[in-house]
């Protein structure tokens, strides 16, 4: 099966680099699924975003991503984000509190984190 080389980088650290068969995310133009040999593109990610990466024979990766950009070539997907964290790193109760914040940036980050842990769609 064809695979993509995928890299997720936040301002403060490299989050993940590896191979995947499919990547799902949300851009300012709408939801998008990326398969190998996708048309090259660049897109801005929404602030309350969750990236899901399907991998052959392994559990899907779910990453909460705060803003940033997506760059796609036929063989590679790069995500450059303000911040990002794996679902396993997220405190769901703290994310719920953030999602209820009056500050729109904090609320967006909380929603992204809740999407990553599967608490909301």
From Swiss-Prot:
GO cellular component annotations of the record: plasma membrane; proton-transporting ATP synthase complex
Key word Cell membrane present: yes
Parts forming coiled coils: none
Matching InterPro entries: ATP_synth_F1_dsu/esu, ATP_synth_F1_dsu/esu_N, ATPsynth_dsu/esu_N
Record-annotated disulphide pairs: none
Membrane topology term: Peripheral membrane protein
The keyword Ion transport is annotated on this UniProt entry: yes
Superkingdom of origin: Bacteria
Subcellular location: Cell membrane
Any one GO molecular function term: proton-transporting ATP synthase activity, rotational mechanism
Keywords associated with the record: ATP synthesis, Cell membrane, CF(1), Hydrogen ion transport, Ion transport, Membrane, Transport
Family: Belongs to the ATPase epsilon chain family.
Record-linked HAMAP family: ATP_synth_epsil_bac
Function (record text): Produces ATP from ADP in the presence of a proton gradient across the membrane.
Subunit structure, as described in the record: F-type ATPases have 2 components, CF(1) - the catalytic core - and CF(0) - the membrane proton channel. CF(1) has five subunits: alpha(3), beta(3), gamma(1), delta(1), epsilon(1). CF(0) has three main subunits: a, b and c.
Name of this protein: ATP synthase epsilon chain
Organism: Mycobacterium leprae (strain TN)
Primary gene name: atpC
